[in-house]
Each structure stands twice: as structure tokens, then as C-alpha cells.
UniProtKB/Swiss-Prot annotation:
This is L-aspartate decarboxylase. The keyword Lyase applies. Optimum pH is 8.0. It catalyses: L-aspartate + H(+) = beta-alanine + CO2. InterPro entries: GrpII_AminoAcid_Decarb, MfnA, PyrdxlP-dep_de-COase, PyrdxlP-dep_Trfase, PyrdxlP-dep_Trfase_major, PyrdxlP-dep_Trfase_small, Pyridoxal-P_BS. The modification N6-(pyridoxal phosphate)lysine is found at K231. Its cofactor is pyridoxal 5'-phosphate.
């Protein structure tokens, strides 16, 4: 019920504290299945300082709009492009929807079809329903990457584009994006890469010597990329990114908003009102950590993920789904449902994903947290 009379701040905060006691918190070390993390303290400071900025009305916040553009260009540069076109958006879901919308609008085809891997994120299902696009699912290889030959088989005159994944949600697998890029160029189709997770991991992992195929704008067939700063970028939620290679993609999804303070403003994002503070935090975190800073974060988590995977192999009844590619480790068990239930009963924030449990070694995850998890896992697996 909407209260007739207000309560004091202390009373409201006390009630909030009581009602959120069931929430798991990142600092507990119990959240192991999330692709988000506790934001960097500096990013929190920036958001708090600029909490009132609205990028949906850039005429009021001209400086913030310019900073967003700089943030987009820095992300584009990280992804192999000197200058990019796009926005800081609510997350990977919105970014993927915008990419599909751009492909559909530019193609101008009746009954449009989009080819994507069976491993693709559910946001593409939302995009398809919203935009009237038929999804054509491509099979996976034994290593869980998309079968490029199957992608080619499914190209028709109704195909508006192809999707590749750089860091799948379940396993952190990176598709053969170079082969998909060549295929897209051969057929004159745009390739969208969903690097919501991998975008803030792969460039740094490659610099560290990890053998991961190219996935970004260095490949000519790649026309758009989703990247989420609120994942490994450690920016407060919400902060996703959509980057286009060419301005025509952004123009194709822009609509006129004539009543705003800046005059005739063209708006491409799904959300009208947008938190400028988070875009500023993206800019600030990139400036603060730089490539070397993020490389150190990725180095620690990639090494920790590989140690964790090696420990899992020692537990009877537990098996890896595949060797980790990024900082995601997924494992299975013959008694997965019971195992998941027992782990949750002990307070672990994990979930069974398509027949396995996924552990994401995010910045908040420390070795001591994983050691505690392994102790519980060994005990439960032995009893089951």
C-alpha cells in the first residue's frame, strides 16, 4: 500500500536492511555464478558525484555527452577501431537489440532472418520478438564453438546478418570469429559480435600471451560489437556498450526527439532517459586503470580460473565441461541437481546452466573463496 504518512530516514533504512537480508553480497565471497561484480570504489565515487546527469537530454548536459562519446571511442580503440559510433547503454541485452535493429533496418527485407549460435544469449530472443526477426540457430562443434559450415548452410536471401559470441554465457567460449568474418564478407552480410563478457577480458588476455582468436574490428567483417563495462570493467550497473564500425548503423536506428533542451536531437537507444553518471564512470575507469591496470586484473583472474579448474579435476564425480578459455569454469556431475541444491543450502550463489554449474572468477572472487567452495564441493560430492 502507498503510505499516507512518511517515515524517518532511519526507519526506512532499517526496514530496507531487514528486507534485503536474504540478498547475497559480493563481499561475502559466496556469489560465484554472476558475471557482475562489486564496482570499483573510484567508479562508485564518480557515479555519486554525477548522479543527476541525463544523457537522454544531452542539451542540458553537453559536457557529459562529449564524455560519453570519448568513452565510446576508447572502447572502440580497445576493440581495434580508431573511431567508433555507439552509446553506453543499460547492458548487453539493450546493445544486442540495437545491433539486430540496425541490421534489420539497413537490410530492408521482408521476413528477415538472423543466424546465430545455439550458445547465444537469450537477449536475441527478446530482440527477435520485438523486431519481427526470425532466429535461425546454428549448431555447435564438440568444443562448443559455432559450426561455421552450418552457419553458411543457413544463409538465404532473407538473412540480414550473422552473430558470433566472444565469451559465451555458459562456458566463456570464443567462436571462430575470423572465419565468421570471412563468411560475412563473402556474402555481403554484417557480423555482430556479442562480447558482453569477453570484451573486457580478451584484449588483455591476448596481451598476456593467451592464445585466443581475434574477435573485434581488426576483422573487416565485424560491423558491431557488444561490450559490458559493468562486468569485468567494474563499472556500477547499468553500463553496457554498443559500438558500430560505421555511422550508417547508428543512423538507421535513430529517431527524432524534437522537444528536448538541445533542440532536434536524434536518439538511437531504447531508453530515453539514460544515466549519464554511469557513462562518465566508464570513461573514468578507463582513464584510471588504463590498459595496464585492466591487464593486471585479467591476469589474476585468468590464473585463478586455471588453478580452480585443476582442483576440480581432482574431485571424484566432478568433471570439467571443457578447459576454460576465459575466466569462466564450468563443471558437471552425474548428480547435478542434488549437488546444486546442496551448494545453495550452504549459501553459495551458483546455478546449473544447461546441465552444468558455471563459476565466473570475477574481481570480487578471491582464492580463499574458491578454497572454501572446493571444501564444500568435495564433502557434498563424496556424500552423494
Amino acid at each position: 500500500m502507498f503510505p499516507e504518512r512518511g517515515a524517518s530516514e532511519e526507519e526506512v533504512l532499517r526496514e530496507l536492511e531487514e528486507k534485503t537480508r536474504e540478498d547475497l553480497t559480493f563481499d561475502s565471497g559466496k556469489i560465484l555464478g554472476s558475471m557482475c561484480t562489486y564496482p570499483h570504489p573510484f567508479a562508485v565515487k564518480v557515479v555519486m558525484k554525477y548522479i543527476d546527469r541525463n544523457l537522454g537530454d544531452p542539451g542540458l548536459h553537453i559536457g557529459s555527452q562529449k564524455i560519453e562519446k570519448e568513452a565510446v571511442d576508447m572502447l572502440a580503440n580497445l576493440l581495434g577501431l580508431e573511431k567508433g559510433y555507439g552509446h553506453i547503454v543499460s547492458g548487453g541485452t539493450e546493445a544486442n537489440i540495437l545491433a539486430v535493429r540496425a541490421m534489420r533496418n539497413l537490410a530492408g527485407i521482408e521476413k528477415p532472418e538472423l543466424i546465430l549460435p545455439e550458445s547465444a544469449h537469450f537477449s536475441f530472443i527478446k530482440a527477435a520478438e520485438m523486431l519481427g526477426v526470425k532466429l535461425v540457430w546454428a549448431e555447435l562443434n564438440d568444443d562448443y564453438t559455432v559450426n561455421v559450415k552450418d552457419v553458411e548452410k543457413k544463409i538465404t536471401d532473407r538473412t540480414i546478418g550473422i552473430v558470433g559470441i566472444a565469451g559465451t554465457t555458459g562456458l566463456g567460449v570464443v567462436d571462430d570469429i575470423p572465419a565468421l568474418s570471412d563468411l560475412a564478407l563473402d556474402y555481403g552480410l554484417p557480423l555482430h559480435v556479442d562480447a558482453a563478457f569477453g570484451g573486457f577480458v580478451i584484449p588483455f588476455a591476448k596481451a598476456l600471451g593467451y592464445e585466443i582468436p581475434d574477435f573485434d574490428f581488426r576483422l573487416k567483417g565485424v560491423k558491431s560489437i557488444t561490450i559490458d563495462p559493468h562486468k569485468m570493467g567494474m563499472v556500477p550497473i547499468p553500463a553496457g556498450g554498443i559500438i558500430f564500425r560505421e555511422k550508417k548503423f547508428l543512423d538507421s536506428i535513430s529517431v527524432l526527439a524534437p522537444y528536448l533542451a538541445g533542440g532536434k536531437i536524434w536518439q538511437a537507444t531504447i531508453t530515453g532517459t539514460r544515466p549519464g553518471a554511469n557513462a562518465l564512470a566508464v570513461w573514468a575507469m578507463i582513464k584510471h586503470l588504463g590498459f595496464d591496470g585492466y591487464k593486471e586484473v585479467v591476469k589474476e583472474k585468468m590464473e585463478l580460473a586455471r588453478w580452480f579448474a585443476s582442483e576440480l579435476k581432482k574431485i571424484p564425480g566432478i568433471y570439467l565441461i571443457r578447459e576454460p578459455v576465459l575466466n569462466i569454469v564450468s563443471f558437471g556431475s552425474e548428480k547435478l541437481e542434488e549437488l546444486e541444491k546442496e551448494l545453495k543450502a550452504r549459501g553459495w550463489g551458483v546455478s546449473a546452466h544447461r546441465g552444468y554449474i558455471r563459476i565466473v572468477v570475477m574481481p570480487h572472487v578471491k582464492r580463499e573463496h574458491l578454497e572454501e567452495f572446493l571444501r564444500d564441493l568435495r564433502e557434498i560430492a563424496k556424500r552423494l
